[in-house]
Amino acid sequence: MFGKNTYLHLPQVSSSLHSRAATSVVDLNGNEIQLHDMLSGHYLTTANAPVLESTALFNNNNNFNHDVVNGLNRDPSPTFPTKQAVKKDRHSKIYTSQGPRDRRVRLSIGIARKFFDLQEMLGFDKPSKTLDWLLTKSKTAIKELVQSKSTKSNSSSPCDDCEEVVSVDSENVTDHSKGKSLKANNKCKEAMDSHQAAAKESRAKARARARERTKEKMCIKQLNEAIVLRNHQFEVSGTREAFVHPVFGFHQQNYGNASHENWDQSNLSSQSNQLCAILNQHKFIN
């Protein structure tokens, strides 16, 4: 009478009625009829699966819409991690002191031309044979290189070389700085010596000028003293003549005047001699 789809989706239409079916009583035409949940087992077993799937899809759609609104444009389809294929190197590595090395060697254009020309001249079909031939021919050079490396490593390590270079540089810097300081000190000493010599010379000249001034002052003082002494003698001689009384009259007066004149002349000559001697001495000293 009812289709399968309508029968299955009948509880979805009135979910509240289904929730109340087991516990509530419905009044139909005054008669109390208790509804039994006859479809509960069938709903839980058959109809629950599609409802759960539909709700899961609805939740996924809601999550996708929420991500789009928030700016996260994620793929709603489930993603599975895929393993990237690792490329296998067909060539085996060679382990050296500096780590694994590839057996393949990339040559420049010029070296490749020379190498293949040599290979053609030798008639080898493989490049490894050509390299073997080159290594065998250069054994002596390789031995010399190994010996030189060993002697250098035994004689001095790189740290020692660096320390020696640093010490030499520091010594050169100190010597250069010492040389500069010595030159500066020498210049300062020379300047001080020249200044001191000029000061000494100026002081000596000042002392010489002072001595000349003192000598001139002494000469002038002696001349003034001689003049004062002569005037004093003139005054004394005039007072003595005033108190002399004539004894013999006219002859006595003339004798007195002659003697006075002779005394004055001798006094003046002695003073002039003294002045000449002082002046001559002053000139000789200068």
From Swiss-Prot:
GO biological process: any one? specification of symmetry
Q: Which GO terms describe its molecular function?
A: DNA-binding transcription factor activity; sequence-specific DNA binding
Alphabetized, the UniProt keywords read: Developmental protein, DNA-binding, Nucleus, Transcription, Transcription regulation
| Taxonomic superkingdom | Eukaryota
Name of this protein: Transcription factor CYCLOIDEA
Q: Name one GO cellular component term.
A: nucleus
UniProt keyword annotation of Transcription present: yes
**Chain spans, region Disordered:** 72-100, 193-213
Q: TCP domain spans which residues?
A: 87-145
